[in-house]
């Protein structure tokens, strides 16, 4: 991966469909999220299509599935397939994995194998969909131990989710699990764990900013929202106290980097801060520099 050639690193993209056409979520949840985000373009690009999309734009992308099989009954896109696609497109794709925390010891073993054999750089958790509190010691802490030990990254969805939005009962998805203060406990208990709080954390934006300011290992990605809707305090912190800890993320394919970047250019972000957010902070966190 040539850092000099890349204009940006998108730290938040999804592998929505496997090579066999299997989706990571059922159709109702996919359709609801498409309506919520007003998706432009193809909703379920293949891994190869995603690589080509980012290569055309001279961007790199962190890519992952979401394993929430215990809660949803739907198998995820295989982590191994995501990692293999990233290896085949190593100029643009960076593999993360996702492991249902309710897999227990089998999940812990799988996490270690994915790092050692497949070169996975981090793990995505979606507490809303997976149905767990990030600070539940009995459920997730053994996984965090492996992630901290291997020097990889734990990326947590925070705040409201478009998944299930508008579906009766929200599709059974509960928002309470994704308050970033639950991740504050994780950061305190695993002081060397590298953490990303994904998204502007509505309705807990101030909590996310407090956690990222207080805990050295905690970063924030800006995915899932058009920048024109960012809360003003998020923009203020990105320009100042958190200028080295805020990361560009789109949430592709539900939100394209083209749309995100066009709106980002309209924000009052300092010229010296823009390259940090778009590439430099992510490159350092991912160990690419």
Feature-to-residue mapping (PLM):
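Catalytic pocket-lining loop regions of alpha/beta-barrel enzymes
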Residues: 121-122, 134-247
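Short, flexible/disordered intra-domain loops and linkers
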Residues: 25-28, 38-39, 71-74, 164-177
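Catalytic metal-binding/acid-base residues of hydrolase active sites
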Residues: 14-16, 100, 128, 159-161, ...
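Mid-to-C-terminal alpha-helical segments outside catalytic/metal-binding sites
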Residues: 1-14, 18-56, 60, 112, ...
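Conserved, mostly hydrophobic/aromatic
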Residues: 12, 82, 95, 123, ...
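Short aromatic-enriched loop/helix-cap "lid" or pocket-rim segments at secondary-structure transitions
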Residues: 19-25, 75-76, 108-109, 166-169, ...
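Alpha-helical scaffolding within the catalytic cores
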Residues: 43-50, 77-83, 107-109, 180-183, ...
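Active-site gating/metal-coordination segments in enzymes
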Residues: 60, 68-165, 228
